[in-house]
């Protein structure tokens, strides 16, 4: 009988939730839910120098926002933070010391740096050289006594089996192996401050919590042989490992960097801009995995049912912000109005645009939104001065028939009564201009759209004109003429 599936996401509270870490959490979540396993959150807070206040809360809040839930965490279980488990780590460090599988090291940082410099100058691969090599028992005792008398606090190092072979069959990469002699020598498992190092603590935690599968990024591959050494030293069975490929920037082809300003890389950014969490969840799930086929829009339940670890990609996952925004637009277009309005409302309120037209404006621009915060620039037309035209828009408005179209349409608007001024009655007026002037297609619609809204593309033109209002639409047409045309006859005709 196979052992129960237990997986974990173990963030460090050192900042906001990055898209890469969110993917690690999400794949562990999908794997657990797909196979009826247990999903665990554990906080790895042993790096006190990088600890950020509220970092843990931020991580958990953003995971919840994405729609993930978990079975065990610091919220429900004691000692699920590494800082609460120091006594347990010390127990196993003492065991390794007693068994001669680890030892206290008194070498200083300055000595380590000098040795590293010597090795590099000699063209050697930097590695720790056991400080006790060649010492007799008496010399070793004297060395330790002198170091302790000088107030030097030791670290604890694991004694590495240099001839050992450390291998595993990776869930993603296949067979991987490392030689013990290529690890860099005996490595520190306990720092001078008494805290364990990552590669020691994570093994104790995973064993204690009975983790069956460790699914993480492939930047952890180099950590795996060190962790296997700890499993070997303590006589424990190691879990299965799966290392997901890197996430790269689709535009540069390089590893996603926090300096890539063309991407939103933190989940907090998506929350603040008003993305739907379901869209972000869907997008992240397809970074390095796909269920096959052409379909790309999946609900959470569908993703759980479809998730297959055997389809995790061996090639880097390309992060494409345009693809993310396309997917977000798909979700917003098909979401119910109440959901989208709730996302847009805070932005409208902050901008002082929560007027009687607010709901109509959201309804008008809902098909265009990629994120809820876009409702502000999209609705500038209704609350700000007429926008400056682009060169492409100016080129359209320099057409020979533009003045004819605008004069005719302005006259139609002026002739409409307040009672008749409705979206369903505006389109017939445009068609009437077509019939009167013989001008049709883009030559008809584009000048009207640009003159009224200042844009070549947008929502349905009659709805835009209706929400803008008859008087303001007429004003925009007049102002457009004043800006771009210098023909006295044309200006007089528009102003009459």
Swiss-Prot record:
Catalyzed reactions per annotation: tRNA(Glu) + L-glutamate + ATP = L-glutamyl-tRNA(Glu) + AMP + diphosphate
Keyword Ligase appears in the UniProt entry: yes
Binding site for ATP: 258
Gene Ontology cellular-component annotations: cytosol
GO BP terms, alphabetized: glutamyl-tRNA aminoacylation
Primary location recorded for the protein, binned into one broad class: cytoplasm
Alphabetized InterPro entries for the sequence: aa-tRNA-synth_I_cd-bd, aa-tRNA-synth_I_codon-bd_sub2, aa-tRNA-synth_I_CS, aa_tRNA-synth_I_cd-bd_sf, Glu-tRNA-ligase_bac/mito, Glu/Gln-tRNA-synth, Glu/Gln-tRNA-synth_Ib_cat-dom, GluQ/Sye
Motif ('KMSKS' region) on chain: 255-259
UniProt GO MF annotations: ATP binding; glutamate-tRNA ligase activity; tRNA binding; zinc ion binding
Motif ('HIGH' region): 11-21
Record-listed E.C. numbers: 6.1.1.17
Keywords: Aminoacyl-tRNA synthetase, ATP-binding, Cytoplasm, Ligase, Nucleotide-binding, Protein biosynthesis
Localization terms from the record: Cytoplasm
Family per record: Belongs to the class-I aminoacyl-tRNA synthetase family. Glutamate--tRNA ligase type 1 subfamily.
PANTHER family recorded: GLUTAMATE--TRNA LIGASE, GLUTAMATE--TRNA LIGASE, MITOCHONDRIAL-RELATED
UniProt-listed HAMAP family: Glu_tRNA_synth_type1
Known function: Catalyzes the attachment of glutamate to tRNA(Glu) in a two-step reaction: glutamate is first activated by ATP to form Glu-AMP and then transferred to the acceptor end of tRNA(Glu).
Complex formation: Monomer.
NCBIfam families: gltX_bact
Protein name, as recorded: Glutamate--tRNA ligase
């Amino acid at each position: 009988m196979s052992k129960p599936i237990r997986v974990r996401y173990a963030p460090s509270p050192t900042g906001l939730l990055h898209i890469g870490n969110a993917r690690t959490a999400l794949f562990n979540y999908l794997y657990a839910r797909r196979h009826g396993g247990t999903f665990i959150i554990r906080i790895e807070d042993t790096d006190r120098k990088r600890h950020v206040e509220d970092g843990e809360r931020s991580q958990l809040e953003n995971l919840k926002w994405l729609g993930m839930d978990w079975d065990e965490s610091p919220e429900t279980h004691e000692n699920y933070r590494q800082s609460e488990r120091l006594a347990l780590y010390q127990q196993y460090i003492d065991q390794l010391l007693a068994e001669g599988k680890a030892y206290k090291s008194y070498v200083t940082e300055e000595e380590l740096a000098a040795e590293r410099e010597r090795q590099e100058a000699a063209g050697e691969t930097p590695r720790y050289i056991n400080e006790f090599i060649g010492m007799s028992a008496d010399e070793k005792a004297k060395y330790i006594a002198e170091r302790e008398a000088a107030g030097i606090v030791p670290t604890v190092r694991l004694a590495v089996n240099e001839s050992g072979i450390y291998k595993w069959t990776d869930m993603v990469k296949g067979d991987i192996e490392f030689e013990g002699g290529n690890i860099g020598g005996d490595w520190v498992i306990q720092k001078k401050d008494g805290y364990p190092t990552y590669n020691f603590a994570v093994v104790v935690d995973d064993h204690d919590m009975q983790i069956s599968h460790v699914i993480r990024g492939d930047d952890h591959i180099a950590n795996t042989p060190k962790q296997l050494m700890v499993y070997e030293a303590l006589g424990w069975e190691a879990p299965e490992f799966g290392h997901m490929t890197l996430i790269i920037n689709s535009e540069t082809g390089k590893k996603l960097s926090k300096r890539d300003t063309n991407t939103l890389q933190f989940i907090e950014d998506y929350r603040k801009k008003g993305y739907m969490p379901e869209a972000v969840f869907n997008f992240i799930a397809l970074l390095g995995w796909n269920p096959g086929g052409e379909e790309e829009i999946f609900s959470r339940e569908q993703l759980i049912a479809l998730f297959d670890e055997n389809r995790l990609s061996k090639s880097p996952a390309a992060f494409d912000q345009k693809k993310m925004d396309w997917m977000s637009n798909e979700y917003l277009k098909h979401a119910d109005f109440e959901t989208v309005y709730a996302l847009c409302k805070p932005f409208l309120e902050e901008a002082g645009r929560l007027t009687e037209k607010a709901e109509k404006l959201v309804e008008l621009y809902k098909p265009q939104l990629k994120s809820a915060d876009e409702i502000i620039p999209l609705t500038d037309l209704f609350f700000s001065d007429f926008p400056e035209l682009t060169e492409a828009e100016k080129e359209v408005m320099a057409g020979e028939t533009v003045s004819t179209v605008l004069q005719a349409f302005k006259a139609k608007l002026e002739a409409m009564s307040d009672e008749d001024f409705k979206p369903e009655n505006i389109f017939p007026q445009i068609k009437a201009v077509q019939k009167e002037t013989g001008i049709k297609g883009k030559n008809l619609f584009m000048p009207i759209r640009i003159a009224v809204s200042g844009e070549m593309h947008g929502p349905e033109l009659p709805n835009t004109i209706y929400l803008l209002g008859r008087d303001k639409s007429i004003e925009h047409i007049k102002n457009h003429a004043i800006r771009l045309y210098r023909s006295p006859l044309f200006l007089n005709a528009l102003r009459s």
